[in-house]
């Protein structure tokens, strides 16, 4: 592959979050990220009811922090649609093109909405807000940033996040950014465990002949054999469970 083609296939994950949807900012966000403004194009998109598993894996780096639970409620739409669970969703998009990660990050602006307004007025996140987080007694613990949009921070994060949210067959074959492989085994999942045979209640993640990310198939094999894996089973499985069940 020529160098220009390699650069052209850089991809990044964008999530239009529940607060943007609640405030009817979807059209604005999409117009800001249009090919006219960014030189980037869609590689894939989907409407996602975000499960607890998917939310937890997406924000895994924040596990254990005081705002983690609130962050999960935020991305799952529980905070903006407390009595309307059918409206809880995000729009997940893969953008592709030269310098995709940095171009989208530039348009989004700083993560903190107040900082975004001060340093880059007019950017997408300048329309966001900060929300106070309190414990059960009412004590203020800190703030949560409701900043409308997620964008991969770097190419390594982009790879992890794309593989977390999207299967290879969600993306046109010519736009696959990472190696794929045909599964030679069956993999089933139930209650945090992997199996290679079907039983009642087990969900089929990959069947023999299915196409998967090569790194996922390697991780599934290691996990099934009880070997250490840098990729937790939830990070592989979460995308296959997208929109399978509605969480209250």
Task: Describe the residue ranges of each PLM region.
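Non-catalytic terminal and connector segments of soluble metabolic enzymes
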Residues: 1-248
């Amino acid at each position: 592959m020529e160098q220009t083609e390699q650069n052209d296939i850089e991809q990044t994950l964008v999530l239009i979050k529940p607060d943007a949807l609640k405030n009817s900012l979807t059209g604005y966000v999409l117009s800001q990220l249009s090919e006219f403004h960014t030189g980037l194009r869609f590689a894939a998109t989907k409407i996602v009811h975000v499960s607890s598993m998917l939310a937890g894996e997406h924000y895994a780096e924040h596990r254990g922090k005081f705002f983690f639970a609130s962050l999960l409620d935020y991305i799952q739409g529980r905070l903006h649609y407390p009595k309307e669970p059918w409206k809880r969703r995000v729009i997940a998009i893969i953008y592709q093109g030269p310098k995709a990660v940095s171009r989208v990050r530039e348009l989004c602006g700083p993560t903190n909405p107040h900082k975004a307004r001060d340093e880059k007025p007019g950017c997408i996140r300048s329309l966001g807000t900060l929300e106070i987080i309190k414990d059960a007694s009412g004590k203020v613990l800190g703030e949560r940033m409701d900043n409308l949009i997620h964008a991969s921070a770097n190419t390594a994060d982009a790879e992890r996040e794309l593989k977390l949210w999207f299967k290879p067959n969600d993306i046109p074959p010519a736009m696959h950014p990472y190696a794929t492989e045909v599964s030679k085994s069956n993999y089933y999942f139930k209650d945090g465990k992997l199996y290679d045979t079907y039983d009642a209640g087990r969900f089929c993640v990959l069947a023999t002949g299915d196409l998967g990310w090569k790194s996922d198939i390697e991780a599934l094999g290691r996990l099934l054999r009880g070997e250490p894996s840098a990729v937790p089973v939830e990070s592989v499985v979460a995308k296959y469970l997208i929109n399978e069940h509605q969480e209250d």
